């Protein structure tokens, strides 16, 4: 595919590979351990900003005003400066968010396959505690039939509009916010409420919003920045989303849902905008696609404002939420993330440790061959963070890249030939295989589903 068309079709091919958990996890009950009777549980609100890279938000120092509403919200919240996703794809990253498992553990490697019903999710855990649960999604990859993440939700609102005729069905932020507002105004819910809201706008193809476009263009001109129009188009979508995020936060406040609440706002993955000669996400694991915004608001449980400089992961969201609620995870459910609630409340530094990531890249033929049992279904790219050192292994070629991201945020100087590796490729692959127990299965998709996945770049 020609590189100049890459923003219109991200360079991601679909691997329809679905797996099951190990027998211990698969047999585990979805019932989370109950809290004490009469406990006043707060509402839980999780807002996902699809395809949103941290360094293109004004909250994280970007010179253009792409996220003023998120920045205002963050003034009274905990801001994670170094949050990372574990996989740069929408379906797998959200499955990891809702299960605190890596893709090779929950089995949702690629967009287009639903997660197993017997894997406990955050929605199911909260429903077991008496929460009402409602989700509002805006991208085809999170459609219930595609991802299966509707499990545990009483309401799973996925009303899409055909923005580009028969292709790229999605809901713009304005419509998502309106749907949430209508739901809350109807009063057809009970408290405590778990509310999941998903914005998809920064995902390619980017469309132009005149108000935000002019504001950003003028801001760039004022600082003498001749900004690339494709980059401006991405920023324009981020700013449009932020505008409606501001409206959403006002609506939540007017409904009394912010006074006793746990609110997460975070990105599921980022977007490469030409760095490393790549546009899109899914086929690279550089910082542009892994470094995401993550903000936590929990009045009375967290400091009024704090900035966390240690490494954090989207896998930490589920266990931290349960920790804030005083809920134990289901027996046998192997959470990979950490409960950060005690560290955040006390102001202690977050614990150090390795954090892993993975993705596939390559051709559709290669991915389909992976479905055959005689072909090892290993990721093409995997790696880990250890402190400020980042390791990347290209499994096909055993090529290793090592970066010191504390001084080389653009990952331009590979240190593999200059320093001893803190891991071996065998060690990384051992970690991968130790946690997996996958059985390839097939899933029937409608012609419409296939066309939508093609339009989003997930099937060649």
Predicted region positions:
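Bacterial N-terminal signal peptides
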Residues: 10-21
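Catalytic domains that recognize anionic headgroups
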Residues: 19-460
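Bacterial N-terminal signal peptides that target proteins for export
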Residues: 2-12
